């Protein structure tokens, strides 16, 4: 095999490795068994003779008495703060601080170990092609 064919083969391997490293993993599929057929339910015929209703003894209501004093509204409570903007939300206050620059979240691609390994293999193949 000449060197150009070998380089083309290695380059195709690099391309396939790079594509596989970036492709998402297939979702696992579960096969559910088909539902089993249930026998038809037969309705039972009601008996032709109806039973008489059972008498219910209702309790007698208690006599109601009217209150002697009329209800009066209670005075408002004063321990709650008055509605309105608080002192910290005035237009002259500074905006809230942003996220700390040193606390950046890791990249999702580099957190995936399969992507990292695939990229390392692709880099090795690329180095072989350029050598």
From Swiss-Prot:
Propeptide: 108-131
Chain positions found as 4-hydroxyproline: 24, 26, 28, 34-35
Kinase found in the keyword field: no
InterPro entries named in the record: AGP
Lipid positions (GPI-anchor amidated serine): 107
Secretion signal span: 1-21
Subcellular location: Cell membrane
Compositional bias (Pro residues): 25-38, 49-64
Low complexity bias (residue ranges): 65-76, 90-106
Modification comment: O-glycosylated on hydroxyprolines; noncontiguous hydroxylproline residues are glycosylated with arabinogalactan.
Assigned keywords, A-Z: Cell membrane, Glycoprotein, GPI-anchor, Hydroxylation, Lipoprotein, Membrane, Proteoglycan, Pyrrolidone carboxylic acid, Signal
Residue spans crossing the bilayer: none
Domain of life, per lineage: Eukaryota
Annotated glycosylation sites: 24, 26, 28, 34-35
Membrane topology: Lipid-anchor; GPI-anchor
Function statement: Proteoglycan that seems to be implicated in diverse developmental roles such as differentiation, cell-cell recognition, embryogenesis and programmed cell death.
Protein known as: Classical arabinogalactan protein 2
Species this protein is from: Arabidopsis thaliana
Gene that this sequence comes from: AGP2
